[in-house]
Every structure is written in C-alpha cells, then in structure tokens.
C-alpha cells in the first residue's frame, strides 16, 4: 500500500443544511476503502487534528474532519474559535450529530468508498464519537478518553456537555475505548460504569486502560504524551478499523 495522499479543505453540508468547512485527506491509490470521520477535540480544528486526518489517509482510509466551530468563528485561529464557542456553551449535541452525518454522507459519496464509515474522537471528541454512534448508523466508533458520557462535568465544562449514558441502548456499532488510568475526566470509575452498562446491554465493545497515562496521552505536542500508551493505542485502532471498516 502506498502512503501517498491528497489533503485539502472542502465544504460539506452539515446540520440544518449549513455549509461548513472540513479537512479531507485520502490515499492516492484506488479503493475500495473504508472511511473515518475525525471529530476534533475541545481545543478545536487545530494542526494536531489535521495531522491525525493525514495519518488515517496514509494508512489507507479516506478521513474527514468537519470544523465544528466554523459557524461561530469562520476564519478564526483554533484557539480563538474554541474560546468563543466555549463561552457560548459549546457545540449542541443535535448539531454535532447533524455535522457528523453530513461528513459521513460526503465520505460515502467519494470514489473508492466501500460504504463503511467509522468515527473517532479524543477528549470532547470522544464523547461526541459515542454520541454519533448512538445517533447514526455507523460501522465503528473509537472513544479516546471521552469525558462526561457518564457524569456531569465541573463548572468549566461547556453547558452542552451533559451525560448521555441513557443513549447506550441505541449504540449502532462496535466501540473501542482507550483510556488512561490516571485520568480524572473520565476517571476509572466512569469508564467502569460505561463498560458495565454496555456489557449489560450486549453491545460489542472493547476497552483498554493504560497505567501511568492521564488525559491527552495521544497528544505528541503536550506534556501529557505517553509514548508507550499512544503506540499501543494506535495499534489497537488500526486493528479495530481493519476488522470493522475493511
């Protein structure tokens, strides 16, 4: 498989018919291939997220990250856009689902698509990946330390981020969860509660929690980065999407 890719900014139709900015990367070799919607974290549509999109393309998947903040802050820097959206209460859940649906529709229409779409998110994006998988017919979902699925957040958390564990019966696809045992949001107790509920419901899922890792252990540009956990996590992501997306 060649790792040659093409990456570009595109426009997709999101929630309510809104045209929103998105970052697309895809392999240059032919399909058929599965696709991945990358949901950016709370810090926004930033260079690290775009690098992740390109990483998926280099590994054989068409990948697309919608800019969830493009309505409120078109053209703003990721930091400024994130700060403004947080001050407005965050991204409403209904709008998030509509934007992911639009991104999935865009990916399925690409030449070479095999019709299968997964979703992945880190931090708030992990919660959003779970939300999307409980709201849309997807083929796979990866939640990387997504908080506030089970629990209410502290005062600094955007008002839109309410617990969504009640949506678990609607989970439409297999779920991979990757967590740090030293994380506080979500803490091990919240991870265990989500695991217990999905097991009770008979929902296919696999969770892995890493010793010595806290929130953001995938982030190579942050002090929270933990190479061993991140490398193993990526290995599990490739295996999971290989099985579920083809």
Regions picked out by a protein language model, each given a short descriptive name:
Residues 1-246:
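N-terminal cap/leader regions of alpha/beta-hydrolase-fold enzymes
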């Amino acid at each position: 498989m060649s790792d040659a890719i093409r990456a570009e900014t595109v426009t997709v139709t999101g929630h309510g018919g809104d045209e929103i900015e998105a970052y697309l990367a895809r392999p240059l070799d032919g399909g058929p291939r599965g696709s991945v919607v990358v949901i950016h974290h709370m810090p926004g549509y930033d260079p690290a997220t775009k690098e992740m999109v390109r990483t998926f393309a280099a590994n054989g998947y068409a990948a697309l990250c919608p800019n969830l903040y493009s309505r409120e802050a078109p053209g703003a820097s990721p930091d400024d856009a994130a700060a403004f959206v947080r001050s407005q209460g965050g991204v409403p859940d209904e709008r998030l689902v509509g934007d992911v649906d639009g991104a999935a529709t865009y990916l399925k229409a690409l030449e070479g698509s095999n019709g299968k779409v997964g979703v992945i998110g880190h931090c708030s994006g992990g919660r959003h990946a779970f939300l999307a998988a409980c709201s849309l017919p997807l083929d796979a979902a990866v939640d990387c330390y997504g908080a506030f699925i089970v629990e209410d957040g502290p005062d600094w958390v955007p008002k839109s981020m309410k617990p969504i564990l009640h949506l678990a019966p609607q989970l439409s696809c297999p779920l991979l969860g990757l967590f740090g045992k030293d994380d506080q949001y979500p803490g091990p107790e919240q991870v265990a509660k989500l695991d217990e509920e999905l097991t009770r419901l008979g929902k296919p899922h696999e969770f892995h929690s890493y010793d010595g890792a806290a929130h953001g252990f995938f982030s190579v540009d942050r002090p929270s980065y933990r190479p061993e956990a991140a490398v193993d996590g990526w290995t599990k992501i490739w295996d999971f999407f290989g099985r579920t997306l083809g």
